Amino acid sequence: METLDAIQLPYLGVVGASLIVILGIILLFPLGSDPFITINQHPRDLFQTKAKQQFEYNAAALLNEGLQTGHSAFRLVTNMVTYLILKDQYAEEIKNDSRFGAHEAVDPVLLVDLPGLESMFQGSLHNQVPPMAVRALNKELVHLTPSLSEEAMNCLQTRWTDSTEWHGVSIPETVLALIAQMTTRALLGPELCRNPEWLDIAKSFTTNRAIAVAAVQSWPSFLQPVIHWFLPPCRALRRQIQCARNIILPALERERRAYCSDQPTKREFSNLVFIDQYAKGARYDATMAQLRIIAVAFQTTSDLVEKVIARLCKHPELIEPLREEVVSVVGNRGLHRHSLRKLTLMESVMKETQRLEPAVIIGMFRLAKEKVTLKDGTVVPKGTNIAFANDLRFDPEMYLEPETFDGYRFQRMREDPAKIDLAPFTKTRMSHLAFGHGKHACPGRFLACDEAKLILCHILLNYDIRAVEGSPPELRARGMFVQLDPGAMMSVRRRRGTETAPHG
């Protein structure tokens, strides 16, 4: 005869499972009316699987659907978190509001604080120091331009050769190699910028980390602190970081000895030394600090340069005017930072490309650290992840024929007193949020601008480029990201009778 406990056990299991489902429904669809509509919310989509998949493959269409509703704010379920999407009109109000956290919005999504994913028992300084280190680097860019120029030409000659016959090259592979070599030169100096082992790590770390994060995020959040120890992408990432440590830590020791033995005023800027001194003896992960900075720098600059080159392949009529501008500005004076600032047509082409093809279709991410009532009465609940819609980049009152690519658009703005402030590439505005806006705007945009210009200068002066016949480079969208097709190719040849531009 069955005992009462034995009889009740199956029913208790059913009841328990039911309670879990009910709790999940309450958490996903809390009681009370939500003043914001959710664009991709679906009935019975308990774990938002359908909504996330829809965003993964139709993010731009969903964003446009939200904008067409007439609401100034709406929710959008993404493959990472659910965002409250705000129109760009709010950017000026929120940009410096301390009630909205920038790092608090990004760090949990990127899992930078997940113990053991990258480092343990070494504190979190490596997550905090990159903005300060990049700002320190910005002050040295005027001195670094000749060195960055030298690395750009070295890399192009190595990859594209001096052949005067047309031959095919990969756009993404070329740009990634250029950015890796140039950024390493800026951050770590001449010792590592041509080190093949380090460059391989630098080029692949960002992608490998993205794969690892995606693998972890596919599991429930309460399992993530444990499951990453067993996931192959995470284990591969930790192995790669250890290889990086075998390079960075000896380099740091050499920098410490050199800094102590030399007069500081005679030493070049070293990002390794800057962070080491910033730590003031505190324990920190020197390797992760460098990888953090490199990951951000690569993402910003490589995306921009790839898309500009692709645009030039589609608009060859811009190549000769750009080349003439470079020749007239550089002349015999070499590529200095002061001469780079005079390349206004080049800046215009870069900014117009970025306006139409930003790396992410939404931007300026924030987390509401408390309940906030905006000036128009819109209430943003505490704990809400917000992002901006990037809608003003298509505002016809701001941009004539905004859907059309116009390489001269921002150059003409320099002649209009009402719009001159919008023209510089590194200037942030609520109508152009590619670098964010306000006190949390991307500090690496100045290095990105200089590197992009130097690369384009050397290409224009020394090579002819064109699209591969029948296969123009195209973009691919996945979730909120818009990137050049990884297989994008173009044809290049060394220009006859040309010489490398002087570096300074």
From Swiss-Prot:
GO terms for molecular function: heme binding; iron ion binding; monooxygenase activity; oxidoreductase activity, acting on paired donors, with incorporation or reduction of molecular oxygen. It is a single-pass membrane protein. Pathway: Mycotoxin biosynthesis. Heme binds at residue 442. Its main location: membrane. It catalyses: fumitremorgin C + 2 reduced [NADPH--hemoprotein reductase] + 2 O2 = 12alpha,13alpha-dihydroxyfumitremorgin C + 2 oxidized [NADPH--hemoprotein reductase] + 2 H2O + 2 H(+). One of its GO terms (cellular component) is membrane. PROSITE patterns: CYTOCHROME_P450. Keywords: Alkaloid metabolism, Heme, Iron, Membrane, Metal-binding, Monooxygenase, Oxidoreductase, Transmembrane, Transmembrane helix, Virulence. One of its GO terms (biological process) is verruculogen biosynthetic process. The keyword Heme applies. It holds the Pfam family p450. The chain crosses the membrane at residues 12-32. Its cofactor is heme. The keyword Lyase does not apply. It is found in: Membrane. Cytochrome P450 monooxygenase; part of the gene cluster that mediates the biosynthesis of fumitremorgins, indole alkaloids that carry not only intriguing chemical structures, but also interesting biological and pharmacological activities. The biosynthesis of fumitremorgin-type alkaloids begins by condensation of the two amino acids L-tryptophan and L-proline to brevianamide F, catalyzed by the non-ribosomal peptide synthetase ftmA. Brevianamide F is then prenylated by the prenyltransferase ftmPT1/ftmB in the presence of dimethylallyl diphosphate, resulting in the formation of tryprostatin B. Belongs to the cytochrome P450 family. This is Fumitremorgin C monooxygenase. It comes from Aspergillus fumigatus (Neosartorya fumigata).
